[in-house]
């Protein structure tokens, strides 16, 4: 039996998680937010006051951490941390943790194991190129920096967090640079991925487009 695997890649704030989650609900398939796994590890790094440049200790932490998905909730060492991993500080630091080759190898292995034997939609930075290179459908979502910063601004404002939108733009550009320039599994479009620019589109517009593309595979 062949299982459906949908890979959604793209930069920070392009709408990957929101769209992937909606598609998972529509198709009744498992959703895996791989970015949440890197955020969970970053949360643990910061909680333990580990220097973000101390790669050796971060790798050891990754080797000794239990990061799990249960019913779309993210658990770190048995504790649900859905809200904790969405802080501004983690937004700024997660790319530094995610660029470490050994960390990516550990988490990619875990992601592939989760995908085995079931229909999945997975979003991240290197799903179509590295995690699920033989995915049924590969999508690369993008949007302007201004649009992505505005989305993040509104998301944080909804949670009662006041931020400067110009600072968010700078943070997004910095994350884009780190993600695309890292030596191992950088953020790049898979050759066979379909680009969708979500600037100005509603969530439902993008969801419908991807579901229609899947029907044509």
UniProtKB/Swiss-Prot annotation:
Q: Which CDD domains match?
A: CMPK
Q: Which domain of life is it from?
A: Bacteria
Output the Gene Ontology cellular-component terms. cytosol
Q: What Gene Ontology terms describe what this protein does at the molecular function level?
A: ATP binding; CMP kinase activity; dCMP kinase activity
State its location(s): Cytoplasm
Its chief place of residence is: cytoplasm
- GO BP, sorted A to Z: nucleobase-containing small molecule interconversion; pyrimidine nucleotide metabolic process
Q: What is its EC number?
A: 2.7.4.25
Q: What class of enzyme is it?
A: transferase
Spell out the reaction equation it catalyses: CMP + ATP = CDP + ADP; dCMP + ATP = dCDP + ADP
Q: Using the record for this protein, list the coiled-coil segments as residue ranges, or answer none.
A: none
Ordered alphabetically, the record's keywords are: ATP-binding, Cytoplasm, Kinase, Nucleotide-binding, Transferase
Residues involved in ATP binding: 10-18
Record family assignment: Belongs to the cytidylate kinase family. Type 1 subfamily.
Q: What is this protein called?
A: Cytidylate kinase
**Species the sequence originates in:** Alkaliphilus oremlandii (strain OhILAs)
